[in-house]
Amino acid sequence: MIQRDRLVNDFEAMSQFTAPGEGINRLAFTDADWAGRQYIIDRMVDAGLTVETDGFGNVIGYKVGKNPDLPVVMVGSHTDSVPNGGNYDGVVGVLSAIEVIRSMNDDGFEHDHTIAVVSFMCEESGRFGDSTLGSKAMRGALTVQDLHRLRDKQGTSLYEVLKGRNLHPDEIEQVEYKRPVKSFTEIHIEQGKVLEHDQKRIGIVTGIAAPERFYVTIRGNADHSGATPMNL
C-alpha cells in the first residue's frame, strides 16, 4: 500500500534543494539540482533498485522482474525546475514511481517485466533554452554539436557543464537507450486548470501541445513605426 507519510517526507526533502529566491530554483546541473539528483539516487538504493547512470547524468533504477528478457516497463519524470518553479512539477513523477516500488516491496508483489524508474536530467528549458534534453539523449537525438551550441545566460555551453560534472559529453551519442521498452508512464501535475475546473482528481492524457523553437534573424532599420512607410 502507498505510504502517504513517506511521500510527504520525500517532497519536503526535495524542496530543500533549491537556490535562493521564490519557489523552487533547481536549474539543470546546478548545485541544487545535483544535490536533488543524489537524493533520488539514495532513495532508489534504499528501495532496493539497481541504479545506473548514463553519460548525460540520467538516473535509472531497475527492479528486476521474473522474466528479465521481457521489455522493461519504464516510469518516471524529472527533478530539475524552471526559475521560481513548484515543488511537484516533474518531482511527483519520480517520487511516486519510487513509492510504488517501496509499496511493491512491502506487499511482496511479484511482476514479470523489469521495472525501470527514470529521472531524466535537464528536461526543463530554464537554463539552456531547450527542453527534454535528458530524454532526447536517451532516444539518441542529441549530438555533440548540440551540446556545444546550447549555452546558458553566462555563456557556458552544455558541453562544458557536463564536463564539470564529470560526465561524458563526447560519448553523448552512446547514451541512446538500447533495451526494448514495453511502456513509459509518467504521473504529472496538471499544468492547466481543466481538472480543477471540472473537480476531477485525475486525468489520462491523450494528446499534448508540442512546442517548436526557431532561431530567427531579422535585418532592417530602426524607424518610427507610425510614420515610416514600408517601401522606404
Protein language model features and the residues they cover:
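Glycine-rich, flexible beta-strand/loop modules in the N-terminal catalytic cores of phosphate-handling
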Residues: 22-30, 47, 220-228
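Thiamine diphosphate
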Residues: 28-48, 71
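Alpha-helical metal-binding/catalytic segments enriched in His/Glu/Asp
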Residues: 75, 84-123, 212-218, 224, ...
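N-terminal capping segment at the start of a domain
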Residues: 1-30
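Midchain, well-structured core segments that form catalytic/ion-binding scaffolds
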Residues: 122-123, 129-232
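Short coil-to-beta-strand
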Residues: 7-10, 68-76, 210-217
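Active-site cofactor/substrate anionic-group-binding motifs, chiefly glycine-
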Residues: 51-87
